[in-house]
Swiss-Prot record:
<keyword id="KW-0810">Translation regulation</keyword>
<keyword id="KW-0496">Mitochondrion</keyword>
<dbReference type="GO" id="GO:0005739">
    <property type="term" value="C:mitochondrion"/>
</dbReference>
<dbReference type="InterPro" id="IPR031467">
    <property type="entry name" value="Aep1"/>
</dbReference>
<comment type="function">
    <text>Required for translation of the mitochondrial OLI1 transcript encoding subunit 9 of mitochondrial ATP synthase.</text>
</comment>
<feature type="transit peptide" description="Mitochondrion">
    <location>
        <begin position="1"/>
        <end position="19"/>
    </location>
</feature>
<comment type="similarity">
    <text>Belongs to the AEP1 family.</text>
</comment>
<keyword id="KW-0809">Transit peptide</keyword>
<dbReference type="GO" id="GO:0045182">
    <property type="term" value="F:translation regulator activity"/>
</dbReference>
<protein>
    <recommendedName>
        <fullName>ATPase expression protein 1, mitochondrial</fullName>
    </recommendedName>
</protein>
<dbReference type="Pfam" id="PF17049">
    <property type="entry name" value="AEP1"/>
</dbReference>
Length: 518
């Protein structure tokens, strides 16, 4: 009972904190994406707001939604396990934190409303249309320098040659900058010689070495607060710098070059914007920066630029996305630890529209190991089933799906049910004529569960030829099943001794039968 004014005030403050913690604060760019796995955050036990969940492909099925809405006590999704990656506000520090949340409600009230908003958000992601960026680079290549203008740059070219062997970067930058200033002082206003054209010309013709490129990047930074007064000019210069970074492969990204380019980007932000400059960069330049940060292993910046492209309705190149996924795997060493999977989800949260509508085989292969619940796996498989390249994607990923199904539980009956679900999802893709190589993998997986009925059913239905080698594989799988599930389901239909005897006598040769005799 609340009896005092102090208790009432305390109760109101607590309610306010809880209400505040359920709001959505989209501050991904300012959020450390690698979470602190050593901290146990009790607030993650609360069901997050649908907008706080960053899972890019989980979609509860109609049956899951119905079950949640029809369960009076503790309705849940994903069995209420703490595996829903979420960005939430910490109730005390009010910092945005990355946690694995439980989708387990206290009671049935509000579940339907929560599901409607969650499903609506997923539908919005499915409806996002992305188009590749225009590859026209004409505006970057047209330099407004006449032969007369280029002749005026001879002094600048001579300075670049004279200081080539000078080790002092600062003095080299000052020498080039002084000569650049002399050109503008001598030049009449009628010729309209622009700083960005000169720098782009120099980068294109003299930026072939890492040292010269660093020099010209530093000169560009010095000119930011004098003659480079428009983002259009910076787009041109950045384009040529990043083209040279990509072309100069020995080495492509030395630490000094990385520092110089990042200092230039920071200076651009300070010069034109209070925060970040992505909104004013050309999509081609954003793609270049994305590739650059992927190469240098800067995942946070890679995520920022990738997310910005997607928000602008631009579909990044498949090769760039693949390199991004490879960089994530390298960073986490292809780990399947819970903490690492949670952090990996943060880095791919922006990919939801791509997963839904433009998924590639490499992307699907990356996502399968990240599933921690069978319902997640089904969501991903349903996305593949509806994709334009469904058959090719299933051909490449089905063996991985079958293997992954058996990792969620050790219960042979649940595993058998899950295997049957996967088989039923993919069968229509093949017109009910699933290739024998995949049917054989399903049979071996059912053998690992000791499910004689399903093995016999699939052998008969798909007329699988039981070669000597394949029979030995079945026997090894059945032996593993007997060791792993010795005390489970021995009396269940399809698993008991009578079915075992029937299967052995009908499907195995005499020489193979003895291997399974008690």
């Amino acid at each position: 009972m609340i009896t005092t004014v102090q208790e009432i005030s305390k109760w109101r403050n607590l309610c306010f904190i809880r209400m505040q913690s359920r709001k959505w604060y989209p501050v991904l760019k300012k959020t450390p994406l690698v979470a602190d796995g050593r901290k146990i955050i009790k607030h993650a036990d609360k069901v997050p707001h649908p907008g706080e969940i960053i899972h890019p492909f989980y979609q509860p099925t109609a049956i899951e939604q119905f079950t949640a809405c029809a369960t009076e006590y503790n309705p849940s999704l994903l069995d209420g396990k703490k595996i829903a990656p979420s960005l939430i506000k910490h109730p005390v520090s009010l910092k945005t934190i990355l946690v694995d949340s439980k989708l387990k409600f206290d009671d049935i009230r509000g579940v339907n409303r929560w599901l409607m908003e969650f499903v609506a958000r997923r539908q919005h992601q499915r409806n996002i249309v992305l188009t590749p960026a225009s590859k026209s680079v004409r505006s970057f290549h047209v330099l407004h320098l006449s032969s007369t203008d280029i002749a005026k740059l001879r002094g600048l070219e001579n300075v670049l040659s004279e200081i080539e062997n000078t080790n002092d970067l600062q003095s080299r930058v000052e020498s080039v900058n002084n000569e650049l200033q002399n050109i503008f002082d001598r030049d009449s206003k009628q010729t309209r010689l622009f700083c960005e054209d000169i720098l782009a010309y120099l980068i294109k013709n003299y930026g072939n070495s890492t040292e010269n490129l660093i020099l010209l990047i530093n000169v560009t930074e010095m000119q930011l607060f004098s003659r480079l007064d428009q983002m259009k000019a910076m787009n041109i210069i950045l384009y040529h710098i990043l083209c040279k970074v990509e072309a100069n492969e020995n080495p492509p990204c030395s630490p000094t070059l990385v520092t110089a380019l990042e200092n230039l980007l920071a200076a651009i932000n300070n010069r034109f914007f209070p925060g970040r400059c992505e909104n004013s960069l050309h999509p081609i330049v954003i793609e270049q920066l994305l590739s650059y940060f992927i190469i240098t292993g800067n995942l946070n910046e890679s995520k920022n630029f990738l997310g910005h492209l997607i928000k602008k309705g631009i579909l990044p190149e498949a090769t760039i996305i693949n390199r991004y996924l490879e960089a994530i795997d390298v960073h986490f060493d292809k780990s399947t630890k819970i903490f690492d999977i949670r952090s990996k989800f943060a880095f791919i949260a922006d990919l939801a529209p791509i997963i839904e509508n433009y998924g590639t085989i490499d992307l699907f292969k990356f996502l399968i190991p990240m599933c921690r619940h069978f319902d997640e796996l089904c969501s991903l498989l349903n996305i593949i089933r509806k994709s334009n390249n469904a058959k090719q994607a299933v051909d490449s990923t089905l063996p991985i799906f079958i293997k992954k199904v058996l990792t969620f539980t050790k219960d042979p009956m649940i595993n058998s049910g899950n295997l049957s679900t996967v088989f039923n999802i993919v069968s229509p893709i093949y017109g009910q004529n699933v290739p024998s190589e995949f049917v054989e993998k399903f049979i071996l997986s059912f053998a690992l569960q000791g499910n004689y009925t399903m093995m016999a059913h699939m052998i008969d239905t798909y007329k699988i030829k039981l070669s000597h080698k394949y029979q030995l594989q079945i026997i090894r799988a059945l032996k593993n099943s007997e060791r792993n599930h010795a005390l489970k389901n021995t009396g269940a239909v399809g698993y008991n001794k009578e079915f075992k005897k029937y299967f052995i006598e009908k499907y195995l040769n005499c020489t193979e039968r003895e291997a399974l005799r008690p």
